[in-house]
Amino acid sequence: MIDDIKSDSEERMSRAIEALGTHFNKIRTGRAHPSILDGVMVSYYGSATPLSQVANVTVLDARTLSISPWEKNIVPEIEKAIMKSDLGLNPVTTGDLIRVPMPMLTEETRKGYIKRARAEAESARVSIRNVRRDALAEVKALVKDKEISEDDERRAADEIQQITNKYVAEVDKALSAKEKDLMEI
């Protein structure tokens, strides 16, 4: 019973870490990386489709992405979608190839992105703590139903806290890596 609660908690906490990674990928650094465009949705035959499903996104150099659409008629739609996204990118089209140069980040922009990264990290910490709260409530319910002893409850609470500390440390590590990445010039 307690092992089920712990494994469920650990699984939910790891999902919070994965979500944090996804959010961090959407925060642009000065370097070109295809995952920056993961959230861009292109109008493709009337429906919103992820850019990765209508084109090939590659890195040309440290500051430029190259987008090769699979159909030539979708080039203007891809351009429009990139400009509409809040990434601050301006695509340049040459024939059926779209180049997306990454503008240098200003100090002000970097600080804004760091602030956003910290907010995302705090959100991940909160969701991890909510998982801990739910797990502890389940353990308390087991004690109340006299399915486990109070000693088992204390032991389980300590183990759940250790799991929580491990995942909060992962969040902190991911945040410091993202901050370092953002401050690189």
From Swiss-Prot:
- Keyword rRNA processing listed? The answer is no
Asked whether the UniProt record includes Membrane among its keywords, one would answer: no
Q: Which GO terms describe its biological process?
A: cytoplasmic translational termination
Q: Which molecular function terms from Gene Ontology are attached? A: ribosomal large subunit binding
Q: Name one Pfam family in it.
A: RRF
List the keywords (alphabetical): Cytoplasm, Protein biosynthesis
Q: Where in the cell is it found?
A: Cytoplasm
InterPro entries with a match to the protein in the record: Ribosome_recyc_fac, Ribosome_recyc_fac_dom, RRF_sf
* Any single Gene Ontology cellular-component annotation: cytosol
Please give the HAMAP family that the UniProt record associates with this protein: RRF
Instruction: Write out the function statement from the record.
Output: Responsible for the release of ribosomes from messenger RNA at the termination of protein biosynthesis. May increase the efficiency of translation by recycling ribosomes from one round of translation to another.
User: What family, per the record?
Assistant: Belongs to the RRF family.
Q: Quote the protein name from its UniProt record.
A: Ribosome-recycling factor
Give the originating organism.
Saccharophagus degradans (strain 2-40 / ATCC 43961 / DSM 17024)
UniProt gene name: frr
